[in-house]
Each structure stands twice: as structure tokens, then as C-alpha cells.
């Protein structure tokens, strides 16, 4: 039997879901223009790094901490993590891009569900107490739907892998079949990453690869672009 609560959350993983993810490469485009990424093998190496660094120590760990805060009705903890997610994201384009995606996801979630936590989160943004982040919104939605945190993180990581792969298909370019092979190849790494997230301490939050941040910053100065970040 289909678990409709999981399907409702998985709807937000659809590549056609209008959060703006298709407009962001999060530094990938810089690597492509420098010819560091030029085929499926070099893209997979980059995608593993992005998954095991930025999505582990920032988004994934934040989701685990936010879920615990929701369980304890700790609003101050949620606001603290929202602030950390914004200020530790040093490259301007990725910082602003995450805020834009978070805002779109929150507004769409409010259109679809009467979720008190997301309504509260949106109000905090209007009161200038929160920036809005897609990882936090996704966690709130999963929590509201009664989905366990392990599955919430798996879905979120999958959504990012799928979205970035579709962007790579356009930018490198790759064939659609090659893109689907990459997503299939990455599924075991998604599970490994989720397990790693549950082994981290809160003090590990925000660690990332300097080379990734530098290439995200350098994207501001690329001559020709198809992505915002």
C-alpha cells in the first residue's frame, strides 16, 4: 500500500516543483567553465564532494537539529539554526539563492498545507527574525506529515542530487540517460551521507570544503552563465 504521507513530502522533491532549484548550480558552473568538470565521471566526483561536505555539515545536520527542536517546541533553537544557515554561507550568490528558494518553498507549503510550524516560520521572516531556508522548511513539512527524520533527510538529499544532476545535463552537457545513471549511482552515497549526519556533533555544523566555497564565490565573475549561482 502506498504511504500517502511520504508521497506528499516526495512531491517537494519533484524537479518541476517551482522552488527555483533549476536556476542554481551552487558553484558547479564555475567548475565546468574551468574544465574541471567535463563529463559524467568528473561530475560524479564533484557531486559526491558536494553531498559529503555541504549537504552533510550544513543542510543535513541543520535538519537533524531542527527536527529535535520541533519535537521540543524550541522556537529559539529553530531561529538560531536559521541564522547560522544564513551567515555561514559565505558566497553571496549561494546565500541569496538559498534564501530565495527557502522563501518559495515556504510560500508553496503554506498554499498546500495548514502547517502551524511553517506559518510561524513565515511570520518570523515577515518580522525580520528569520531568513527562510529550504532545508528547514522541508524538515518542518516532513515533521508535520509525520515522516521520520531519517526519511526526511533521505528525500532532501535525493532532491538535491536529482536537481544538480539535471542542471549538469544541461550545462556540461550530458544525455538524459547518463543523468539517470548518475542518480542511480548516487543512491548508496545518499544512505551513507545520512548515516554520517547522525554521527556528527553540533559543533561540526558549517564545516565545508574551501575549494567549493571559492568556486561558488568565483561564479560572480564568470563571463557567460546559465545559472544564478
UniProtKB/Swiss-Prot annotation:
One of its GO terms (molecular function) is nickel cation binding. It is found in: Cytoplasm. Its main location: cytoplasm. One of its GO terms (cellular component) is cytoplasm. The keyword Coiled coil does not apply. Keywords: Chaperone, Cytoplasm, Nickel insertion. Required for maturation of urease via the functional incorporation of the urease nickel metallocenter. HAMAP family: UreF. Belongs to the UreF family. PANTHER family: UREASE ACCESSORY PROTEIN F. UreD, UreF and UreG form a complex that acts as a GTP-hydrolysis-dependent molecular chaperone, activating the urease apoprotein by helping to assemble the nickel containing metallocenter of UreC. The UreE protein probably delivers the nickel. This is Urease accessory protein UreF. It comes from Staphylococcus aureus (strain MRSA252).
